[in-house]
């Protein structure tokens, strides 16, 4: 079989990947539960809480799916059939795309929410949840269509000696795809991702400019020293910038590893490193929300206190 078959013998990669998935599932579960409680207990729940809850459940499903795929990569208990391979890998690819999309739309919604009344975005404040929902539904259909080729190209691996397939797990492989088809799919994915990253960059830049103007006006109006405590706007801005910076860095690393993997003909180490990097955002992004939200900090602290007392 291909070198990818040696994955199950690499204990370091196995431990790293399963640790990442476990931490990510725990963090996203906490983030989802906290914002679900907010939505259920508040009289007028904020749209941003709804989208953070959705963002966390999408990442949670992504990591659970990755965990199932990782089991077949490192600890195969039995061969999957083609239907199982196609369903899980298609769902995983779809959830990765939706996580990308949810990150972008959450960034845009936060920008609209933080914009002042004098801003040109004020008219979108009441309509933004509906527009964001419509945009997400559109991207969901788009990602489903982009990933539909996997339902044909993914098969169960029956011939363990063939070098013509690109091995995904011990049970699943990808059929060879023509160069023209690969080029078309790559171009479409690049355009889609460039658009979303550009939208994230614009919204993040807009928030930074707004915050800078706000601080400048505050210094002008109050000559006395300002409070050292960060305002909700400042905490929200730092959250946006941290998420944006973390996302871009991991996206660049993921692209570099992907190109290296193609150059070195699917070396198992590059394959596994790419998987770890491509799921790092889903694992660690919840901690950005947890560390920048007072409600989240109180919830986690009280929960840890109860566990210690037990």
From Swiss-Prot:
CDD domains: 7tm_V1R_pheromone (cd13949). It is a multi-pass membrane protein. Pfam families: V1R (PF03402). Belongs to the G-protein coupled receptor 1 family. Disulfide bonds join 85-172. The chain crosses the membrane at residues 17-37, 51-71, 94-114, 135-155, 194-214, 238-258, 270-290. Glycans are attached at residue 159. Keywords: Cell membrane, Disulfide bond, G-protein coupled receptor, Glycoprotein, Membrane, Pheromone response, Receptor, Transducer, Transmembrane, Transmembrane helix. This is Vomeronasal type-1 receptor 50. Putative pheromone receptor implicated in the regulation of social and reproductive behavior. It comes from the Eukaryota. GO terms for cellular component: plasma membrane. SUPFAM superfamilies: Family A G protein-coupled receptor-like (SSF81321). One of its GO terms (molecular function) is pheromone receptor activity. Disruption phenotype: Mice lacking all but one V1ra and V1rb gene (12% of the V1r repertoire) show a lack of chemosensory response to a subset of known pheromonal ligands and changes in maternal aggression as well as male reproductive behavior.
């Amino acid at each position: 079989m291909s070198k990818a078959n040696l994955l199950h013998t690499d204990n370091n990669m196995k431990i790293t990947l399963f640790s990442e998935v476990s931490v990510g599932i725990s963090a996203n579960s906490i983030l989802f539960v906290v914002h679900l409680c907010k939505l259920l207990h508040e009289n007028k729940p904020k749209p941003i809480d709804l989208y953070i809850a959705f963002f966390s459940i999408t990442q949670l499903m992504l990591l659970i799916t990755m965990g199932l795929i990782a089991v077949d990569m490192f600890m195969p208990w039995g061969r999957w059939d083609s239907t199982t391979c196609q369903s899980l890998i298609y769902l995983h690819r779809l959830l990765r795309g939706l996580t990308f999309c949810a990150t972008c739309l959450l960034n845009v919604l936060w920008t609209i929410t933080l914009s002042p009344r004098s801003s040109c975005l004020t008219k979108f404040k009441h309509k933004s949840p509906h527009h964001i929902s419509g945009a997400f539904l559109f991207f969901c259909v788009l990602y489903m269509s982009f990933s539909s080729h996997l339902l044909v190209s993914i098969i169960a691996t029956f011939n363990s000696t063939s070098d013509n397939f690109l091995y995904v797990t011990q049970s699943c492989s990808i059929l060879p795809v023509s160069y023209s088809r690969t080029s078309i799919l790559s171009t479409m994915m690049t355009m889609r991702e460039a658009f979303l990253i550009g939208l994230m960059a614009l919204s993040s830049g807009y928030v930074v400019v707004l915050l800078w103007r706000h601080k400048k006006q505050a210094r002008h109006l109050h000559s006395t020293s300002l409070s050292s405590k960060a305002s909700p706007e400042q905490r929200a801005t730092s959250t946006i910038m941290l998420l944006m910076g973390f996302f871009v860095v991991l996206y660049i690393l993921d692209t570099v590893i992907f190109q290296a993997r193609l150059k070195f003909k699917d070396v198992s180490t590059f394959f596994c490193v790419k998987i770890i990097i491509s799921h790092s955002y889903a694992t660690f992004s919840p901690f950005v929300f947890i560390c920048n939200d007072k409600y989240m900090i109180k919830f986690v602290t009280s929960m840890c206190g109860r566990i210690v007392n037990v």
